[in-house]
């Protein structure tokens, strides 16, 4: 179905607003993946704050102008799916990485985070970023561990001090 100029402009405007508010983006080649599989992937993405789109590469170049994702322009070759993360920077990378494990034809091309491009081989760096809840839990654990360590050192010092005075 051919899009007229007004429809193309509407798509670019709508997706550009979304892209400007996104935290990260992941680009993938979806050749060989069925429509039903892509639909399931999109549904899973919506649950974790990931918006996926498939548009012509020329429109995608217009969409990413003046966004932190301009570094991805070289990856828009062939059938391209782009996933934008809005709630957590690693959500799209994690989702597409897990999808690619089960679908060998699905190929992650690259990702962008804070204006820097990550090659597909380094997608784990983005996918393994802890969520906000995980980071808070880890910080609390480290603070508790530090307090327990201080208490243990204090008790050992008191025991040593008492044994020296006795």
Swiss-Prot record:
Pfam families according to UniProt: Ribosomal_L10
InterPro entries: Ribosomal_uL10, Ribosomal_uL10-like_sf, Ribosomal_uL10_bac, Ribosomal_uL10_bac_type, Ribosomal_uL10_CS_bac
GO biological process, one term: translation
UniProt entry keywords in alphabetical sequence: Ribonucleoprotein, Ribosomal protein, RNA-binding, rRNA-binding
GO molecular function: large ribosomal subunit rRNA binding; structural constituent of ribosome
Keyword RNA-binding: yes
Any single GO CC term annotated in Swiss-Prot or TrEMBL for this entry: large ribosomal subunit
Subunit structure: Part of the ribosomal stalk of the 50S ribosomal subunit. The N-terminus interacts with L11 and the large rRNA to form the base of the stalk. The C-terminus forms an elongated spine to which L12 dimers bind in a sequential fashion forming a multimeric L10(L12)X complex.
HAMAP family associated with the record: Ribosomal_uL10 (MF_00362)
Similarity field: Belongs to the universal ribosomal protein uL10 family.
Main function: Forms part of the ribosomal stalk, playing a central role in the interaction of the ribosome with GTP-bound translation factors.
Protein name: Large ribosomal subunit protein uL10
Lineage, top ranks: Bacteria, Pseudomonadati, Pseudomonadota, Gammaproteobacteria, Candidatus Palibaumannia
Recorded name of the encoding gene: rplJ
